[in-house]
């Protein structure tokens, strides 16, 4: 706590290997043992005891495992030798297994897509925090929203959410290209990058790092603090003999031009983290059920007795003759085992998966109504999705806020350089604007917009709120409305006299 931020950063720069230290992802525990010896003891309601420091052990889950869990063609059930097989006797009296294809189900991908849609399905909501904005401020606000939409920043954030929910973390870099245009770039584990963030004891970011390997096998570290971009490599060392940089060399240290680290990072659980075991159970039961259905699904013809191998066919029917002495031969069709219990068990697992992951799988067969469905019915049906998305809005707010701050700062530099607004840096710095996610759910746009009109007519919301909340406004809608009011307020020209 006593060390200053710069002292800690300098220590990282002197020992680059420390930048590679990363807290692992975990899931569950390998033991049931409780380290707190007082657990389960009796005590008085007003008693006190010395606090026990946390020592909870967790099981590490690698990001490579996340990647395999996301890919249905890499699931464990495909390599499970405990799935039963069908054994038959061949013509030569030997036995062999019938080839049976195992099935990996893409639950993880479905959960990922539904959670990403629930959080990112709507455009970001922008709010200008100024009770009486000037015309210049309105113009700058409209310009910011237009450039945000034109450069597809919503889509970039959606991809960032999808990557974090797939592999555990993601990095979004805001930078200025050679033409002085503000651009964005995504770093993900799937593309060969490790995202590592170092913070001080108060949780304030110190260094945001990207660790990767190039095509020649040389490892690199790109580290960003509030001022500089540091590039390290473990290639040909240029360090002196007295340098203790752990084999890493500082290639460059450049001023990145932003007021804070331009790398926006987010870390968290993958979308299916709480239900992975249930998904594996569902896959095992499903594959066992498929084997049973393939072997016995169409029933069995059971023949008892000594049957003459030469069968007769009369009027399209095959006649089997029992040649046994006691004449107790019989033929009957054995019905296949009823699948109802297995199907009910699979459905119960599916219900637990939906509850555990916080999203709902609704298929067309589940919709029984042929008319319009009320908004309340939709909310009740998709309550799991709405609750998860509402929680995700809070969890992702810092990510969106930093992304907006960096984009606004970069856009101001771009507008100054291309001459569109020479005062953009000062004006954009004074513009107090925020952005946030708005959870998505199916709804009737006409009814929603009509509700906004009704609220505006009743004086319960302002015109500005209606512009921001409705689904058809353009980014510069306030400017358009202001221009329209100005034109309507202009006095009409005097009519020309014919006299």
Positions of PLM-derived features:
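Conserved aromatic-histidine-acidic binding/catalytic patches
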Residues: 58, 80, 96, 128-129, ...
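C-terminal helix-loop subdomains that flank or include functional centers
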Residues: 320-326, 341, 348, 352-499
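Extended, charged amphipathic alpha-helical segments
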Residues: 5-6, 240-379, 420-422
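Extended, helix-rich architectural segments
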Residues: 1-182, 496
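A short, surface-exposed helix-loop junction/capping segment
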Residues: 137-145, 327-332, 382
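Short amphipathic alpha-helical segments
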Residues: 136, 140, 148-157, 164, ...
């Amino acid at each position: 706590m006593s060390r200053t931020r710069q002292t800690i950063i300098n220590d990282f720069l002197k020992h680059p290997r420390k930048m590679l230290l990363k807290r692992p992802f975990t899931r569950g525990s390998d033991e049931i043992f409780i380290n707190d010896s007082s657990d389960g003891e009796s005590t008085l309601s007003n008693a006190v005891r010395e606090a026990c420091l946390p020592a909870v052990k967790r099981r590490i889950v690698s990001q490579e495992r996340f990647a395999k869990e996301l890919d249905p063609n890499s699931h464990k059930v495909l390599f499970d030798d405990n799935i039963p097989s069908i054994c038959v006797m061949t013509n030569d009296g030997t036995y062999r297994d019938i080839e049976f294809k195992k099935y990996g189900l893409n639950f993880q991908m479905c959960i990922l897509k539904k959670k990403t849609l629930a959080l990112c399905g709507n455009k970001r909501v922008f709010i200008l925090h100024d009770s009486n904005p000037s015309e210049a401020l309105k113009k700058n606000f409209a310009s910011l929203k237009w450039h945000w939409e034109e450069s597809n920043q919503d889509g970039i954030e959606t991809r960032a959410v999808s990557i974090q929910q797939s592999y555990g973390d993601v990095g979004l870099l805001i930078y200025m290209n050679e033409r002085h245009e503000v651009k964005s770039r995504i770093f993900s584990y799937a593309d060969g990058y490790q995202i590592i963030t170092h913070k001080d004891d108060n949780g304030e970011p110190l260094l945001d790092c990207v660790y990767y390997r190039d095509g020649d096998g040389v490892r690199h570290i790109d580290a960003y603090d509030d001022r500089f971009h540091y590039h390290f490599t473990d290639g040909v060392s240029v360090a002196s003999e007295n340098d203790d940089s752990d084999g890493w060399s500082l290639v460059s240290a450049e001023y990145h031009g932003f007021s804070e680290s331009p790398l926006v990072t987010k870390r968290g659980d993958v979308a299916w983290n709480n239900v992975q075991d249930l998904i594996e159970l569902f896959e095992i039961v499903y594959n066992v059920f498929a084997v049973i259905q393939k072997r016995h699904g169409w029933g069995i013809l059971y023949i008892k007795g000594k049957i003459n191998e030469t069968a007769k066919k009369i009027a399209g029917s095959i006649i089997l003759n029992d040649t046994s002495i006691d004449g107790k031969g019989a033929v009957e069709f054995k019905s296949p085992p009823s699948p109802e219990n297995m199907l009910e068990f699979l459905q119960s697992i599916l219900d637990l998966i939906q509850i555990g992951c916080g999203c709902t799988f609704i298929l067309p067969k589940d919709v029984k109504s042929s008319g319009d469905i009320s908004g309340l019915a939709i909310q009740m049906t998709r309550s799991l999705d709405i609750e998860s998305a509402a929680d995700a809005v809070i969890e992702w707010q810092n990510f969106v806020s930093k992304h907006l701050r960096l984009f606004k700062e970069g856009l101001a530099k771009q507008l100054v350089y291309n001459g569109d607004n020479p005062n953009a840096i000062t004006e954009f710095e004074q513009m107090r604007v925020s952005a946030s996610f708005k959870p998505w759910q199916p709804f009737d746009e006409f009814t929603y917009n009509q509700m906004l009109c009704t609220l505006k007519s009743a004086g319960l919301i302002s015109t500005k709120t209606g512009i921001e909340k409705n689904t058809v406004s353009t980014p510069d809608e306030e400017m358009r409305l202001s221009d329209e009011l100005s034109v309507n307020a202009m006095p009409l020209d005097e009519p020309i006299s014919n006299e």
